Structures are given as C-alpha cells and as structure tokens.
Design a protein with these regions (language model features):
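Catalytic-site beta-strand/loop segments enriched in glycine and acidic/polar residues
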Residues: 11, 23-24, 183
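Extreme N-terminal leader/targeting segments of oxidoreductases
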Residues: 1-18
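Short coil/turn connectors at secondary-structure junctions
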Residues: 13-16, 37-40, 59, 161-164
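Short glycine-/acidic-enriched loop or helix-start segments at secondary-structure transitions
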Residues: 30-31, 53-54, 185
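Conserved N-terminal/central alpha/beta ligand/cofactor-binding core
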Residues: 5, 46-177
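Single conserved hydrophobic/aromatic residue that forms the stacking wall/gate
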Residues: 175-178, 182-186
Length: 186
C-alpha cells in the first residue's frame, strides 16, 4: 500500500507534515519547493547558520542538456558524458534520471534567483567544461556554488516568512516536544 502511494501529491497537503533535514543546496531547495507547493515543512539545520553548507565549494557550474547553441546536445549525450566522466562507476539509472531533469533544475535555480551568466541576447550563457563533448555548463562567474546556495537560501527564507516552512536551528532543537511521532520517512 505505502509503496504505491504517492506521498507528495496535492491531496496530502493538509494531512502530512514534511521533515527536511539539512539546509544545504538540496535541503533548502527541497524545503522551499515543498513550501511553495503548500505543504507544511519542518526544516532542521545542523549548522549554526543555514548558509554554512559545503555546497558553497561547487564552483565550476552545472551541466544541463538545454542545447542552446544547437550543437546536438541531448539527454543521452549528457548521460554518456557523465557516466564516462565517472569511469563507468555511477549507477546508470540515476545518472539518466538526473540528465532527464537537468533542464528543470536549471529553470528552478533561475526561478529561485540564481544569477547565472547571460549572453547579450539574454539567454543563459554556457561553456565547455571538463570532458564534455559540447558546451553545456551553466555558471555564475566562478562563484556557482555560492550563488546556488544563496538562491536556495533566499527561497527558503521567503517560505519561512510566509509561514509554510518552520526552520529549526541547533538552538531551537531543544524546544521540540519529546514525544513526536513519525508516520513515514521518504
């Protein structure tokens, strides 16, 4: 029953409280996105500040198969480059899924306010980076990790101010009730 039930769906907005552990790039983005969808989200930060995540160290850029330069880029080519770059040790199903959603990830980052580099025409600029066959790396002038983290954190802060996300820092963890019940963990 639970294996086939889609927990994150509009019918469960009022029934489920979602707990997100971590306020790095993945945690802050997940909490902000779920808050924007209308879920009640409890976000636990294990650092002193949500902006102290190690995601800031990612500086090169993000690869996505947007094919802006009409050079034949595709989901399959991104998949192949990623698997080859990992010396064929990556789980191929996960890499393919990541390649499929790469365009949506870039669009989500732009919607969160990440200032990616742009061409004069207004399109997002991309460059060749690493061993990629085509130019597909979207970047923010050598500060990609910092800008991604600030974009996710600002989206999280907006949802905290709206009230859909409740943020718990290490100081506030002691105020939690001792007898909370977790129904399911995703």
């Amino acid at each position: 029953y639970k294996a086939h039930q889609k927990l994150v769906n509009p019918a469960n907005k009022r029934r489920l409280d979602i707990i997100v552990v971590g306020t790095g790039l993945a945690g802050a983005s997940a909490a902000a996105s779920l808050g924007e969808m209308g879920f009640r989200v409890f976000n636990f930060c294990i650092q002193d500040s949500p902006r102290r995540a190690h995601s800031i160290a990612a500086q090169g850029g993000i690869n996505a198969a947007k094919n802006y330069q009409n050079d034949g880029d595709s989901v399959y080519r991104l998949f192949y480059d990623t698997v080859k770059g990992g010396d064929y040790r990556a789980r191929e199903a996960n890499v393919y899924r990541l390649a499929e959603v790469s365009n949506a990830i870039i669009d989500q980052c732009v919607a969160q306010g990440v200032p990616f580099a742009r061409e004069y025409g207004g399109l997002l600029d991309n460059r060749s980076f690493g061993g990629a066959q085509v130019s597909r790396t979207f970047y923010a002038k050598g500060q990609t990790g910092q800008q991604l983290l600030l974009g996710a954190y600002s989206a999280l802060s907006r949802q905290v101010n709206v009230g859909t996300v409740k943020l718990f820092t290490p100081v506030s963890h002691t105020h939690l009730r001792a007898h909370e019940t977790v129904l399911d963990l995703v």
